[in-house]
Structures are given as structure tokens and as C-alpha cells.
């Protein structure tokens, strides 16, 4: 089909006719990750996802906050609006990272629906107050949501893809520090990584890689009893001046480690 023909075609077909011809709906769904501040929990149980229950939705199932894109509305603003309406959480454009598009013809049994997914990382909020279009909203552990029977549509696939994006951010940026207090120990930082990785990291290897990353963290002449060996206070750190890491920080799963109880290979 020539470029000239396409121009003539779209001059004739009205906006309403084009929408009808396409015959599908465009949604924005958002995956919001946080880390439970309870340091006594296992790292794999601290990663949580913001979910809600739709009025009239499948009984007992959660869904990601999301909805239809309004006319003349940017996708990012749809994400922010729907998260606010359905969970009470306020996001900003800089919080959002696009995950991808999900358009399996069978993803919604009501009609053809295309979802553009976004991901955000936020500190754990004190409470959630849905404004409308939601019967309930809560942060639920990522581990439990790996059971796709708990989620509507293909939202388990979206969450899994979003965690891969989050892991990429942890490898390339200092975003992990947003889940730490202004002063933190190496153990506290390592547990943030372990929460997103969903497996344990060798402490000595973690310390070596982090220490070798220029301007990532700065050691302090202060010590804490948390996150240290018995009788040995742990040194504390603060954030460095660099937002992007000088080198990627990656940690492979050790094949000789025992997989945590209740997990599957899809992590």
C-alpha cells in the first residue's frame, strides 16, 4: 500500500469509523512494587505488589490498577489517574517505567483489549484509600501472586515482566537506595536486592561488588547492631552522588543453593 494511498484513505475515514474498524480497547495497567519495612521477614516475602478488587470482578481475585485511556490523555497520565482512583496512591510521571504491550486475543473474555503496562517503585505507604472503581486495594506479596489463580486476566504475566524491568533498574541505577533509610547497613541494602531477585546473594560477593561501584554508597564513621554478626557492629552508609551506576551490579543465582520453600522455577 503506497504512502499516497494511505493519506487519501485517512482523509476519507472519520475518527469514529477508524475506532470502530479497529474494534478493540486500549487500557493502561500499572504494577507498583514496594518493600515491606518489616526487617524480620524473609527477603523473598518483603517484595509486594499493589493490587485491587474490581466491582463485579471475579470472586476472590485481585487485579492490577488500570483502565481505559481517555480521549486526548497521555498513557502516563492514565496510569497515574487509575492508580489514584483505585488505590488512593499518588504517582508522578518520573516514577513510571514502561514495561511493554500485552495483546493476546484471549487475555480478556469480554472483548479485544490491548494493555500498555507501566511499573513504579515506591516506599511502603502507611495506608491505601481507594477513591472509586475499586472494592479494595492492598499490597500483596509477590510470591503469593505467582499463583496466577489469584489474579484476573493476564496480570500475572504483566507482574512478572515488570519485575524484570525493576531488576534492570537495580543493576544500572541507585534505585535500591530509595528503599533504605538515609543511613543504612550493607545488609539492609543487600536485602533490597534479594527481595527483587527472589533469591539470596552471597554477602561477601555483594559487599565486594557494591564497594567497587564508584559513588554508589559512602561509608560513615557510624555503626549499627542490626545486620551484623553477633558482637560485631555493622558499618553504616549513605547514598553516593551518582544516580546511574558506574558498572552494572548483577548477582547470579547459585545453583548449589536450596530453592526457598514454596517457590517455582519461574521467579
Regions found by a protein language model. Give the residues of each.
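Short histidine-centered catalytic/ligand-binding loop motif
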Residues: 64-72, 178-179
